[in-house]
């Protein structure tokens, strides 16, 4: 069965989960841009030491591919936490061309307005895409192990339930390409921080490979948290792609030993679709 994230003709993967058909949703690859050296070539991160002009040009190129102008993007700081902020058209442009203007202190964004593209950077962490088609809500979260330990996926569901009056049964989620357990070994500190966030009866999303070392399935940990938050299993779509394994396609912070570019995860609704 093909993965839910399939490559477009240009340098990005489209989220093909059916509930996301009314949104512009996907993830860039490492190809098709102007960046050089370890950032070659479609680096989307303004904060990694790459030439800013190259990164902005890369972002403008994606904006053209998507027909979603860069001036309508909203980016956030991404501090490896679990805080989330609702944004509107008044926030458009924040973080799009300058990291200093990114929405501060949060790792998730959501909006109920069309004409806003939520955009976050990734290079192994888990991109989590949310949509409630009946309400016109879209959201995006950055879940590294710290954000997962903080329950960021469930936090998005809780915010939509309590502030937007959306039942978890009306929410659909796509868990995008990220580092898999094949390539992600962690220690006791990490698994101990995740343990309290998981449903008590669920299988653990890790296996011990040697004393104090564990192969962690971060995508599965987030799936379990979404189930615990009330999202139906049939509403959760999970990519099998590993960002570390697919070296020809993705940047990987762990594989590339920290000096590398970033992919961009994005989701939004076009104004003409409302």
Swiss-Prot record:
Keywords, sorted A to Z: Hydrolase, Metal-binding, Transferase, Zinc
EC number(s) stated in the UniProt entry for this protein: 2.4.2.1, 3.5.4.4, 2.4.2.28
Substrates-to-products reaction catalysed: adenosine + phosphate = alpha-D-ribose 1-phosphate + adenine; S-methyl-5'-thioadenosine + phosphate = 5-(methylsulfanyl)-alpha-D-ribose 1-phosphate + adenine; inosine + phosphate = alpha-D-ribose 1-phosphate + hypoxanthine; adenosine + H2O + H(+) = inosine + NH4(+)
Chain residues that bind Zn(2+) 1: 80, 125, 142
Zinc keyword on record: yes
Gene Ontology terms for molecular function: adenosine deaminase activity; copper ion binding; purine-nucleoside phosphorylase activity; S-methyl-5-thioadenosine phosphorylase activity
CDD domains per UniProt: YfiH
One Pfam family named in its UniProt record: Cu-oxidase_4
Sequence positions that bind inosine: 46-47, 262
Bilayer-crossing regions: none
Binding locations of Zn(2+) 2: 182-183, 242, 245
Cofactor section: Zn(2+)
SUPFAM superfamilies noted in UniProt: CNF1/YfiH-like putative cysteine hydrolases
Cofactor note: Binds 2 zinc ions. One zinc is catalytic and mediates binding to the substrate, while the second is probably structural.
Main function: Purine nucleoside enzyme that catalyzes the phosphorolysis of adenosine and inosine nucleosides, yielding D-ribose 1-phosphate and the respective free bases, adenine and hypoxanthine. Also catalyzes the phosphorolysis of S-methyl-5'-thioadenosine into adenine and S-methyl-5-thio-alpha-D-ribose 1-phosphate. Also has adenosine deaminase activity.
Family of the protein in this entry: Belongs to the purine nucleoside phosphorylase YfiH/LACC1 family.
Protein name: Purine nucleoside phosphorylase YlmD
Phylogenetic classification of the source organism: Bacteria, Bacillati, Bacillota, Bacilli, Bacillales
